[in-house]
């Protein structure tokens, strides 16, 4: 059971998202513990997050950002460390060299445009919200500053206002801010770093109210009930997620004929 042990089991925003996209993928990852190495695009995101974390953690005490070069180096180093743990090769994705260059470009935008905009109070802060049901909620806030919660996302396409307004993950962060500070976040912000020919920053702000929190609670209760009942419904056949490019379990999934298409291989350095 995910998040189990001596404490009450918990769900995270990413677990809820996985369960609702594909219950079978959730079962294999969080119930059976069958971990699949991330794609190189995910490792890129991890690298940029490392650069942001290194800068903002020291900024809490200093009030100043690190030099741009230091933030870039921290991001690239985070990317390289991520690769040492293995990654899933995508023939349609970037090469390692190109991916590393993209990380450096994204980190440049991060350092020049995002970092100067915030004086953080909390960075990469784990928050547990105790709930009356079978599961608590546990998540990590990227950044809190001036009553806001900020989440950094690297994407290939620009996110939309509609997406941000509805994201349950961001609703959780707004609630988690109250656990940290006693106040619900006055604004939730996505700092979207977009991988285009010229990487760009898009800041998308939103708010959350009681109806958003009620909707999140309903999702948590539904997912928790499904897990307790052992119900793990697979993704719809033909959905974007149900493909070898986006699901590492595809080739061995009992709900698809994985022999028809195989485009990914697991690469582990040194093997």
Task: For the regions a language model picked out, list residue spans one by one.
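RecB-family 4Fe-4S metal-dependent nuclease core
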Residues: 1-271
């Amino acid at each position: 059971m995910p998040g189990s042990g001596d404490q009450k089991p918990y769900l995270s925003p990413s677990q809820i998202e996985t369960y609702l996209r594909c219950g079978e993928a959730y079962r294999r990852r969080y119930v059976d513990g069958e971990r699949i190495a991330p794609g190189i695009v995910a490792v890129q995101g991890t690298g940029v997050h490392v650069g942001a974390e290194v800068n903002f953690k020291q900024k809490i005490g200093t009030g100043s950002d690190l030099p741009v070069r230091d933030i870039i180096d921290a991001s690239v180093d985070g990317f390289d460390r991520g690769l040492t743990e293995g990654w899933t090769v995508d023939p349609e994705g970037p090469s390692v060299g190109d991916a590393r260059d993209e990380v450096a470009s994204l980190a440049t935008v991060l350092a020049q445009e995002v970092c100067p905009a915030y004086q953080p109070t909390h960075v990469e802060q784990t928050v547990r919200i105790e709930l009356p049901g079978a599961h608590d909620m546990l998540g990590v806030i990227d950044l809190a500053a001036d009553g806001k919660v900020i989440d950094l996302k690297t994407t290939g396409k620009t996110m939309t206002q509609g997406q941000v307004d509805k994201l349950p993950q961001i609703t959780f962060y707004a609630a988690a801010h109250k656990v940290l500070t006693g106040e619900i976040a006055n604004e939730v912000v996505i700092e979207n770093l977009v991988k285009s020919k010229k990487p760009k920053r898009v800041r998308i702000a939103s708010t959350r109210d009681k109806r958003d929190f009620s909707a999140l609670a309903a999702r948590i209760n539904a997912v928790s009930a499904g897990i307790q009942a052992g119900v793990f419904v697979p993704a719809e056949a033909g959905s974007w997620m149900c493909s070898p490019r986006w699901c590492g379990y595809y080739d061995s999934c009992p709900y698809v004929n994985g022999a028809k298409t195989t485009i990914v291989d697991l690469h582990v350095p040194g093997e």
